[in-house]
Amino acid sequence: MAKDDVIEIQGTVTDTLPNAMFKVKLENGAEILAHVSGKIRMHYIRILPGDKVTVELSPYDLTKGRITYRFK
């Protein structure tokens, strides 16, 4: 999948799940499952419930995403 095909949207982490998975409530009200991108994992950036994040969604499956940025 090319980088151009992704949908970027902001949301808030509502719950942490095993294996670095998170439930994220998006700005449009939808709740999705998201995993952490490799760069965030590599730099040991902690993500906790209540954090504002940017999520990349695939146009093919809008229920799963990848967390690419955590706002300070």
From Swiss-Prot:
Stored SUPFAM superfamilies: Nucleic acid-binding proteins
Keywords, ordered alphabetically: Cytoplasm, Initiation factor, Protein biosynthesis, RNA-binding, rRNA-binding
Location(s) in or outside the cell: Cytoplasm
GO cellular component, one term: cytosol
Boundaries of every S1-like domain copy: 1-72
GO terms assigned for molecular function: ribosome binding; rRNA binding; translation initiation factor activity
Top-level taxon of origin: Bacteria
Pfam families in the record: eIF-1a
Classification via Gene3D superfamilies: Nucleic acid-binding proteins
Family label: Belongs to the IF-1 family.
Matching NCBIfam families: infA (TIGR00008)
Role of this protein: One of the essential components for the initiation of protein synthesis. Stabilizes the binding of IF-2 and IF-3 on the 30S subunit to which N-formylmethionyl-tRNA(fMet) subsequently binds. Helps modulate mRNA selection, yielding the 30S pre-initiation complex (PIC). Upon addition of the 50S ribosomal subunit IF-1, IF-2 and IF-3 are released leaving the mature 70S translation initiation complex.
Oligomeric and partner information: Component of the 30S ribosomal translation pre-initiation complex which assembles on the 30S ribosome in the order IF-2 and IF-3, IF-1 and N-formylmethionyl-tRNA(fMet); mRNA recruitment can occur at any time during PIC assembly.
Protein name: Translation initiation factor IF-1
